[in-house]
Amino acid sequence: MHVSCSKCGIEDILEFSKNPDEVFLEFLTRYDKGLVTEKGLSEGLTDEGIIRSEKEIKEMIGKNNPEKFIEKILFSKKDFISEYKILKNSEPKMGSKVNELGLEKEISDFLNELKIKQFYKFQEDAIQEIVFGENVVIEAPTASGKTEAFLIPVIQRIKKESNQGKVFAIFVYPTKALARDQYPKIKKFADKIKINVKVFDGDTKIEERREIIEKSPEILITNFDVLHYHLWHQTKFSSILSSTKILVVDEAHVYSGIFGTNVHYIIKRLKRICKNKLQFVAASATLDDAKTFCEQLFGEKMQLIKGSGKKGETDFVMLFPSLRTQRKLMVELTKKLTDKNHKTMVFSNSHLNAELLAMQAKKQKINIKVHRAGLMANYRMSVEKQFKEDKLQAISCTPTLELGIDVGNVDCVISSTIPVNRLTQRIGRAARKGQRGYAFLTLGNDPISQYYKNHPDDYFEDIEKTYIDPNNPFVEEFQILAMACDKPISKHELKEHQDVIEHHIIEENIIESNNRIIPNFEKINSVLNNYSIRGIGKSIDIFLNEKKVGDRTLPIALEELHKDAIYFLAGSRYKVKELNYPEKNFAKIERIPKDYPYYTKSLTEEWPTIETVFEKRNAGGIEVAFCKLHIEKKVYGYVNIELGQEVTQGEKVMLDTPLEYDFITKGIVFHAPKPLEIMEKSEDEEYTEASGYHATEHVVIEGSNMITGGVSQDLGGISLGTSGLIFIYDGAIGGSGASKALYDRFEKALERSMHIVKECPCKNEAGCPRCTFSYRCGNNNEFLHKY
């Protein structure tokens, strides 16, 4: 822990402690003994591996010529520079001339108007394969011309094959905002060729809906939520989908986990109601094993077409905040960049961190606003508009802006720790116009960041694993019901789902009639209406002065919106004065003084029950099982944490009525070896043993981060006292696939966990935030033992 005097500048490095008073007293004691000096600390920090030597940094820079402000960051002696490099995109291979591909004259003429004379090779390949009717995955960087690669052949096919007034192609985007953002670009092209394009989503007005149904567009832009809803309700809109020949899915990497599993079934349902055999096109900037993933998502064989993009050079710096928090580092970087008039996007991995960062940045006079899910759509659009019009210097955002929404010119991206392919997506937001860009990966004060500090090359190898789980029993049950609503199921259909169909017949959710299976609407209507394909369950609506200002999904809402919790919303803090759960699912918040010094962190308890063991194996001498689990969760209290200091103040506060939630999911369970040698040296063997298992649970979850696709935040963990049993489970109801990825790579997770503990320099018995602590810990990181 770095300690310094704000007046005289003397500084020292001390062992980590949660109690700031203990740190201060230790600092004074060392000062009195003459152990704290004004000179020589940097040399000691280099020897300890806390910062890099100037020689090492110069070797990193090599023949590159970074700008002065980048040099100052590299040589600041405040952080450990794990990596510095110039990112250069390879020049894209050029393909055929526009007039050599046999495109319709109107298409060629319009491309010439746009000054496009020649295609990139990947565009040419995609155009030809799509025109020939092949299923295609287009993998190419952000802003490289992917949209043109699928739009041009679709328009070519429409001109050759379409009957006007029927849907020929559906373009699906993961969010309404992105669909609306892409619409003008697609419409501009289609209008020129006299092809009708329309958007149909939750914001489409009644008159527009009527027009779309009466005179269907050749290209329909929508999302999977809309397709799901209208298919099972058999609306007039669903009836116009049957003529579809091509389904285009942009940003395909988004459809991972529960959401992707639901999308897999919606695509299956769309196939059932379409008169033609559907052709599939997927596009993405970042997908691990894109071909295999898309074949699972679509249930069809796919061809992979890869491309590169032309873009300016980007200075990339990976920093580890040795002497301060990650947030302070990110705020300082934002300040340095915005002071140079560089428009900056700052990505955090959680709502809370995005809000806290914006709050601290505003104190540094940075013109910044928050953009995240859970804020009202009109507020988010306002932030996008202000940034695009240069009225904002910076945006503090979550992955909501990872996708291709146009926010105008961006010079710099600062990101917290995420898998490298998602970082590439974020970096792709900067320097799109060929100017020099700047990208900073700020490692955190957490175990996996400690690992990457010492092993930066591994970071670039840890590609995010994208996965779906078609065998998720809850998704399968809901989607088979929806399928029966879309169109009666024939007796010889869906043999692979026969067990689920028979279960629904027994439960009278569906009825056998004339060799067909039809839905029992009276019984299942409310069940399907309450189902979310995004796997996020129900939400708690948030009200301020009787006006809805946001929402938060369950179960995380119970941890953030319990009575007296401090809740962050759009850069401000509020206190929860009432939570109505589970009857009506709303929370009322009230304003608090700006100088209120605390925020809250909930305290939780969890109990697991093994329902079914799917499979088990031996991994490095440890038996690990992959299971169906029943998790019971209780929020029973909270602690106050001081802003800026990030340490607990005061006593734990117990809730009058604990909040309870339970769900079925998937996970792993293993029996950790008994730490006999450590226990023999301990005065309290039982405490040491239980605390060691608790620390193991934390470190394995953090060690699995990136190995499972950077989704440790989607995993929960439970260690059962001195039993040695450790459970790690999917936070999503029914399971997301993350714990299965951990099960498959368990040996690697254990190996990485060992590195994290051994390489952390702390001597604290309980460990520290960089080895054994977890910010998600429901016990406030108590009862931990590192050794």
Q: Which residue stretches match the model-derived regions?
A:
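Post-DEXD/H (motif II) to motif III coupling segment of the RecA-like Helicase ATP-binding lobe
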Residues: 246, 253-308
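Conserved interdomain linker/interface between the two RecA-like ATPase lobes of SF2 helicase motors
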Residues: 291-350, 468
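Extended Lys/Arg-rich polyanion-binding regions
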Residues: 419, 436-439, 445-462, 477-493, ...
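Conserved SF1/SF2 helicase motif Ia
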Residues: 156-181, 274-277
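Conserved helix/coil segment N-terminal to the catalytic DExD/H
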Residues: 202-245
